[in-house]
Curated annotation (Swiss-Prot):
Classification via PROSITE patterns: RIBOSOMAL_L22 (PS00464)
UniProt name for this protein: Large ribosomal subunit protein uL22
Function: This protein binds specifically to 23S rRNA; its binding is stimulated by other ribosomal proteins, e.g. L4, L17, and L20. It is important during the early stages of 50S assembly. It makes multiple contacts with different domains of the 23S rRNA in the assembled 50S subunit and ribosome.
Keyword RNA-binding recorded: yes
PANTHER family noted in UniProt: CHLOROPLAST 50S RIBOSOMAL PROTEIN L22-RELATED, LARGE RIBOSOMAL SUBUNIT PROTEIN UL22M
CC per GO annotation: cytosolic large ribosomal subunit
Gene this chain is encoded by: rplV
Pfam families per record: Ribosomal_L22
Family: Belongs to the universal ribosomal protein uL22 family.
UniProt keywords, alphabetically: Ribonucleoprotein, Ribosomal protein, RNA-binding, rRNA-binding
Signal peptide, first to last residue: none
GO molecular function, one term: structural constituent of ribosome
Alphabetical GO biological process terms: translation
Length: 109
C-alpha cells in the first residue's frame, strides 16, 4: 500500500528543500517527524506539513496503521520561478527570480 501527498509551488528553492528531504528518506514516520520538528530550516516546516498530509491521507483513504508506515520516497522538483524586478542605479532594473518547487512524499510499509 502506498499513499502520496504533493505540494505544488512551494515558495522555497528546490536546492534548499532537498537538503531536508534527504534527511528523512526511508525513515519511519515517527522518527522523520521528530527530525523535521527540531530542524531549524524553513524547508523542514514545509516538508513536515506534506508528510502530515500524507499521514492523514493514509488514515482517511486507506485506513492504515500509522505505526507501520515509513517514508518510502520523497523527491523535490524545480517548479516555475516568479520573476521580479529590483531597482538599480541610473534608472535601470535587474531581474530577480524567486524559486519555487514541487514536493512529493510517498508513504508505504
Amino acid at each position: 500500500m502506498e499513499v502520496k501527498a504533493i505540494h505544488r509551488g512551494a515558495r522555497i528553492s528546490a536546492q534548499k528543500t532537498r537538503l531536508v528531504a534527504d534527511q528523512i528518506r526511508g525513515l519511519p514516520i515517527e522518527r522523520a517527524l521528530n527530525i523535521l520538528a527540531f530542524s531549524p530550516k524553513k524547508a523542514a516546516g514545509i516538508v513536515k506539513k506534506v508528510v502530515e498530509s500524507a499521514i492523514a491521507n493514509a488514515e482517511h483513504n486507506e485506513g492504515a496503521d500509522i505505526d507501520e508506515l515509513k517514508v518510502k520516497s520523497i523527491f523535490v522538483d524545480k517548479a516555475t520561478s516568479l520573476k521580479r524586478f529590483t531597482a538599480r542605479a541610473k534608472g535601470r532594473g535587474n531581474r530577480i527570480e524567486k524559486q519555487t518547487c514541487h514536493i512529493t512524499v510517498t508513504l508505504g510499509n
